[in-house]
Amino acid sequence: MFTTDNQLPAVRRRHGPAARILATITAAAAGTLAFTGSGQAAECQDPEALTFAMVPTEETVAELELYKPVTDRMAELTGKKIQFFMPTSYASVVEGMLGGFVQVAVLGPYSYVIASEKDPAVEVFATYAKKPGHMQEEGPGYRAALITKKGSGLTSIESLKGTTLGLVDPGSTSGNLMPRVVFGGVIGMDLDDYFGKVVYTGSHELSSVAVGKGKVDAAFVATHRFDNVVNKGEIKLEDVNVLWQSDPIPQDPFVYRNDLCDELRAKIEETFLGLGDQPEAKAFLENVKSNTFVPMSPSDYDIIRTLKAAKDARKKSG
């Protein structure tokens, strides 16, 4: 379960040609039905191959190679061929899960809640417990942080009125949902009314670098993603002011479709929860700044559901 003991104080389904292509792929990859001992159809999916997808990050290309020991282990434990799907947006991964083309994925907390509300078959089973870093704290949580460039004179929330704000992606938790709902409550108005201009940069890395180069005045970034940018030498912690941080957010959920057969889902869980004991997975765990994966359940993300509901209600009333 997600705890905060060690922590410091809408995507729409697409239609048209792309959707039809995805539907065709889904139909071709559909698994066979498994049967119970009594001979009755259990209506669980047991496909010949599993498609594993991840939300794109600033380190996606490097992660493709680092994930190989993980996908190799999944192939060994499940006896399935593993196909890696690297999309270009949060929405693409969600669409793949909803269409059944993707069976296993890494999502952001907000995109997971969006997907699971559209289809309860999308279910979280694990996440990683992070090591402490420059801004990141130890444990299975992280925070949204509002940063400005040191020396810019932007040292208070009040000083940000009328400036340019960088967000990440409409499907991002720390780079859109938390700022709009929680920080919006702090300032008492919509971000678009408080700031002179609000832009989406596309990634936490780009938001962090944009602040450092003065292309945006302020940005909301995830603490663990900011650490990645520091580790790459593109920015230093002392280069920024941290004006605000959110309460802890559960880390990126690893999800599967729960209409997969029980034994198959158990093997997928074993793939990730046992990585800490696999020497060949050391580089992967180092890359995500973790020693181990921990089990997670849908209720661990109820805080995100509450925030989404508040955002949706505000949108309707507006």
PLM region descriptions:
Residues 1-17:
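N-terminal secretory signal peptides that target proteins for export/translocation
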Residues 23-34:
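Bacterial N-terminal signal peptides
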Residues 35-41:
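Sec/Tat signal peptide C-region and signal peptidase I cleavage site
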Residues 44-53, 58-69, 75, 249, ...:
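An extracytoplasmic/periplasmic, membrane-proximal ligand-sensing/linker region
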Residues 47, 52-76, 87, 110, ...:
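Bilobed "Venus flytrap"/periplasmic-binding protein-like clamshell domains
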Residues 97-98, 160, 211-212:
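Hydrophobic residues within well-ordered alpha-helices
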Residues 106-121, 179-185, 210-213, 217-237:
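A ligand-binding cleft/hinge motif common to bilobed small-molecule-binding domains
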Residues 122-139, 194-197, 230-248:
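Short beta-strand->loop
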